């Protein structure tokens, strides 16, 4: 037993602890974001997976979905930036606002993927998602079938976080936060 071996063990344990803590915080953020935008952890997990495969970070996707949720609600009331964009895409804001988020995104993606000039897609994405819209052009261009395929792949790979698992991780993270606050 040498000092080098002991030090390597300590460094490894600290690294593993930090990795676990980061994983817990990421799951906690997923659950809190899902709750904030009125969706499930399962739906948000699938949407994040599809976004990641098309080059969009989870942070960007989360902000885009928050803005899309708000703008869709405004459009359903007859106001806001998204009103004209949704109409141009042939989507009914009042119907969209009553759908689960993943269904809203599937309907939007299907309408968005229809042949239109790239500049028009970009302009529509900005109206629907604000500045995060540019990042989502490739995700939306997949269409309903492409997104559904990615959702199924996420389930197959086990990257979809259940509500029960997310709730348990949130409790663990809250307990760790309290512990480290003392």
Regions found by a protein language model. Give the residues of each.
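Conserved binding/catalytic microenvironments
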Residues: 47
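Short, glycine/alanine-rich hydrophobic alpha-helices that insert into or span membranes
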Residues: 1-25, 103
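Amphipathic/coiled-coil alpha-helical interface segments used
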Residues: 1-7, 23, 32, 116-182
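Secretory-pathway/luminal and periplasmic proteins that interact with or process carbohydrate-rich
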Residues: 56, 73-77, 134-138
């Amino acid at each position: 037993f040498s000092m080098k071996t002991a030090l390597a063990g300590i460094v490894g344990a600290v690294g593993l602890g930090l990795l676990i803590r980061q994983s817990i915080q990421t799951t906690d953020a997923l659950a809190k974001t899902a709750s904030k935008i009125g969706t499930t952890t399962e739906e948000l997990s699938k949407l994040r997976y599809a976004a990641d495969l098309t080059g969009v970070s989870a942070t960007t996707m989360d902000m885009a979905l928050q803005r899309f949720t708000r703008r869709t609600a405004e459009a359903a009331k007859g106001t806001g930036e998204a009103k004209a964009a949704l109409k141009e895409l042939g989507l009914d804001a009042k119907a969209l606002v009553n759908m689960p988020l993943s269904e809203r995104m599937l309907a939007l993606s299907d309408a968005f993927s229809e042949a239109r000039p790239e500049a028009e897609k970009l302009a529509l994405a900005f109206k629907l998602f604000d500045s995060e819209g540019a990042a989502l052009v490739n995700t939306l261009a997949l269409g309903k079938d492409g997104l559904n395929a990615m959702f199924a792949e996420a389930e197959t790979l086990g990257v979809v976080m259940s509500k029960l698992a997310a709730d348990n991780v949130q409790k663990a993270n809250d307990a760790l936060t309290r512990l480290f606050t003392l």
